[in-house]
Amino acid sequence: FYESIKPRETEHFSDKENHLVDTFDFATYSIYNYKMRMTFRSLYSILDKVAFFLNEYFEIGIKEYDVNYKSIWYIAKKKANGEIIYKYNNPIKEKINSNWGLYGIYWIYKDFIEGKKTSPNPKITEISKIRNSLEHKYLKTILTIGEVRILKEKQKSFDDKLAFYISIEELYDIVLFLLKTIRSLIINLI
């Protein structure tokens, strides 16, 4: 994160002599931009790492390929139609009231999962969109000069259904928010 925001006296060698076509969408590309994206991805992956730890520590019994930050709070693996694939013994719900750290982790989970629809914090919704774009589509960071025009017109004028547009400043704010949230998660885990 620091490397993506620290003041730079010279251009990075990987950014020199790169000739890009201007598509008038004010997109910006640089190694520092991608370091910010990698910071986001690394921070978001810590959620699932915490889930793996909790699955082992509390001996929940979720199969390795089914463990994620959502599944550790339930008692069964279900199909999309609601049919139960397998059940597991999940002692976490019983231990939440006596373990303040676990209680904090649970409420961070609630922010992320339920926050997509009902959270008063709009950053949670943006985090979900950014993560989905980084993993399955692509993210275009744009310069502030084009921010107002581009962010209002996003997908309409460019007809680019795979891209998610965000300004560099917004991405910075969201990564900083995620950094603070993951810090809280780790402190609660310890």
Task: Set out the residue ranges of the language-model regions.
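Short, hydrophobic, well-ordered secondary-structure elements
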Residues: 2, 25-59
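Generic structural signal for well-ordered, non-membrane alpha-helices
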Residues: 3, 7-10, 14, 41, ...
